[in-house]
Amino acid sequence: MPIASTEPTPIGRTLITGGAAGLGAAVADGVAKAGGTPLVIDLDPSASPYAAYQGDVTDTRGIEALVARIAEEHGGLDAVVTAAGIDKPGRLDEIPGDVWERVIAVNLLGTAAVVRAALPHLMQVHGRVVTVSSSLGVRAVSDATAYSASKFGVIGFSRALAAETRGAIGVTTLIPAGMQTRFFDGRTAQYAPGPDANLNDPANVASAVLYALASPRGSEIREISVMHEEEPSWP
């Protein structure tokens, strides 16, 4: 029986979707501070100080080609963090179908496309994948059918990927609650966090991602939940 290493895994070439803002940007900063190389994909990558590429994860074939190009330019990939995500709260019969489906496309189909394209490179180096679900990926609430469907789906996708790859790569699912990011910008008061909402600092959540990326090989963190200590939505 193989013995798991006790040495931390070095942080290397880490591809981060949604990496120019919010949680993704915090992860990119953490990767850089750990001595790794952040490789950012974002709809608007201009705010990122790192190697950054414009890409829309809903263009699944296009994003697969972009991931392949990034891997070629940097001689491979060591890790992927799928932090790109959107939401459109509202009742199912009130949200236009194309808007509802875009939430699924970004959060779930985009995640799968990026991981699919990165997988051959990760398999070569026993790389790691960190997918991003949500506390609403384990707990359903009203007016969140698209978001919950996508985030429940990310958990199912990640568990199946771990079973499929059987230790050839590390697979971790991050399950965060609300964070102090622009995620809630533009929402009506009905769906916006109140002034006393317990939102986590994305840097704190990013530290959990870095912990998973650096965990010793052979000892995998399959799922990790991170939230404010007074978060009421868990479980």
What are these regions (language model features)?
Residues A20-A21:
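Conserved glycine-rich cofactor-binding loop
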Residues G55-A65, G97:
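The beta1-alpha1 cofactor-binding region of Rossmann-like NAD(H)/NADP(H)-dependent oxidoreductases
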Residues A83-K88:
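Conserved NAD(P)H cofactor-binding loop of Rossmann-fold oxidoreductase domains
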Residues R91-L92, P96-E101:
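Substrate-binding pocket helix/loop in short-chain dehydrogenase/reductase
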Residues V115, S150:
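Active-site helix of classical SDR
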Residues S134:
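Residue(s) in the substrate-gating loop at a strand-loop-helix junction
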Residues T173-L174, P193-W234:
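C-terminal helical subdomain
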